[in-house]
Amino acid sequence: VLLFDIDTLRADHMGCYGYGRNTTPVMDEIAKEGVRFDDYYCPNAPCLPSRASMISGQYGIHNGIVGHGGTAADMRLQGTTRSFTDDMSENGLFMQFRRAGMHTVSFSSFAERHSAWWFNSGFNECYNVGRRGSESAEMVTPHVLDWLERNGKKDNWMMHVHYWDPHTPYRTPADYPSQFADTPLPDDWIDEKTFEEHLLHIGPHCANEINMWNDDTFPQWPKHPGKLTTLEEAKHLLDLYDDGVK
């Protein structure tokens, strides 16, 4: 089993999901030979809550992780029923592959980036290039290929490969757009107006950083409206973190 975990990649911008430009030819070929989900929903969209749901099989409101800071970023404690190991490490997604007799390996810096060490539970091997999510695919893939060269012909392995390239910081190679110079833009192309609207909603991952608790200080981030005096101002502040706790 080869599982690609590509951070913040939109399905509707991939060829295998019908996007009009040839932006993901390699992944499209892999999709032809693998499993492609038509109806797969993310209950908690930010990076940390999303993977907590994927690993635990629970909504964030149940596993405890609904945000990126404070207690909202901590897995809920099991309590008095915990034995030598907790239920998360024994029953998480990757442990299911291991229980099935597969050798599990991960190439990811996610656990270090978010201090989410539970993410590594169930893996026989974990490889981290040490860039805390700032690495590009060129830094990860050589290690993946090396492992496959040494172990790929063996039976019963499960590999998790994590790429961060679509995530910030955006660093598309300068010559990349030239590949599509002769390809018409799709009808749903993200134009400058859409991008400007997106910038209005950019904020950090912690309520304290966006100055939510001090109405009298000039907001550091454009998303923060200062005082909330109308319903529309309140709607402007709502984001995916709120969705995770409703």
Show where each model-derived region lies:
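Catalytic domains that recognize anionic headgroups
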Residues: 1-246
